[in-house]
């Protein structure tokens, strides 16, 4: 699933491509991907709207239109591509926004897990999925004090806590593993067992890793590309995720993989305590 760095890069490329484009037709080929509103109403609400800009909150994309906002989640493999209307439509294209300039913004999703819904313009706080999100890790709202308070309140594994979007928005499986490694903390450690120094290291690792991942275009581990079709580069920086049995870059011991709350989890048994 694309995490914050990947979604931020999708947002940035979309922001270069679609503002100012006016929707004159919407085609929904997979109705279940439209949530909270019947698909025909979704289409009716969007025709005639102009895209003013693209924002992000956590792993959500928000397309601000003339009178409303489209809230979209890529889920596992969703992608947006801007294409000429004459280009062949692939079988994995499930939603099409056709513009007056004869281009189309197409939403492709091999697994059909992605979702879209229409909300009040700038009213994302009124939607349950957005309202519950915690602070963005690269903003001033993400403070060491609040983070430490949240961590100390739970006995869940620290990796599980990092994946809780109410604690910090946008961290997923890849970056949670990398954060724990950088902080030298075992991912299965109970969050409330961590010392203040360990919590501080996790906080700092979250900021530094997410900053670099955004700068490098995210991680292309499976099929991720941004909206211009470009691969990410941070996968070349990964130290534990996907490195099972490979030598640790610090100590040389083999990286181990376990299941933690149903998620594949990678760590160095020597460096992380």
Swiss-Prot record:
UniProt keyword annotations, A-Z: DNA damage, DNA repair, DNA-binding, Glycosidase, Hydrolase, Lyase, Metal-binding, Multifunctional enzyme, Zinc, Zinc-finger
Cofactor(s) needed for function: Zn(2+)
Active site annotation, chain numbering: 2-3, 59, 263
Positions annotated as zinc finger (FPG-type): 239-273
Gene Ontology molecular-function annotations: 8-oxo-7,8-dihydroguanine DNA N-glycosylase activity; class I DNA-(apurinic or apyrimidinic site) endonuclease activity; damaged DNA binding; zinc ion binding
Enzyme Commission numbers on file: 3.2.2.23, 4.2.99.18
Family: Belongs to the FPG family.
Record's protein name: Formamidopyrimidine-DNA glycosylase
């Amino acid at each position: 699933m694309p995490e914050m760095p990947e979604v931020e890069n999708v947002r940035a490329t979309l922001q270069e491509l679609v503002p100012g484009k006016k929707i004159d037709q919407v085609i929904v080929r997979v109705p279940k991907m439209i949530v909270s509103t019947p698909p025909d109403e979704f289409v009716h609400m969007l025709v005639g709207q102009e895209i003013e800009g693209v924002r992000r909150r956590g792993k959500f994309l928000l397309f601000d239109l003339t009178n409303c906002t489209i809230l979209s989640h890529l889920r596992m493999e969703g992608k947006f591509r801007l294409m000429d209307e004459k280009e062949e439509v692939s079988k994995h294209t499930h939603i099409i926004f056709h513009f007056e300039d004869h281009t189309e913004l197409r939403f492709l999703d091999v697994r059909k897990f992605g979702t879209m819904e229409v909300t009040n313009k700038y009213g994302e706080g009124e939607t349950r999925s957005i309202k519950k999100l915690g602070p963005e890790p690269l903003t001033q709202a993400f403070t060491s004090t609040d983070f430490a308070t949240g961590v100390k309140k739970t006995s869940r594994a620290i990796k599980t806590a990092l994946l809780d979007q109410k604690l910090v928005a946008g961290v997923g499986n890849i970056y949670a593993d990398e954060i724990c490694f950088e902080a030298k903390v075992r991912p299965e450690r109970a969050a409330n067992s961590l010392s203040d120094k360990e919590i501080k290291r996790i906080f700092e690792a979250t900021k530094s890793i997410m900053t670099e991942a955004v700068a490098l275009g995210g991680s292309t581990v499976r099929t991720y590309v941004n909206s211009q079709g470009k691969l990410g580069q941070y996968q070349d920086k990964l130290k534990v995720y996907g490195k099972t049995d490979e030598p640790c870059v610090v100590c040389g011991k083999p990286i181990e993989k376990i299941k933690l709350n149903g998620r594949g989890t990678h760590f160095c048994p020597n460096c992380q305590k």
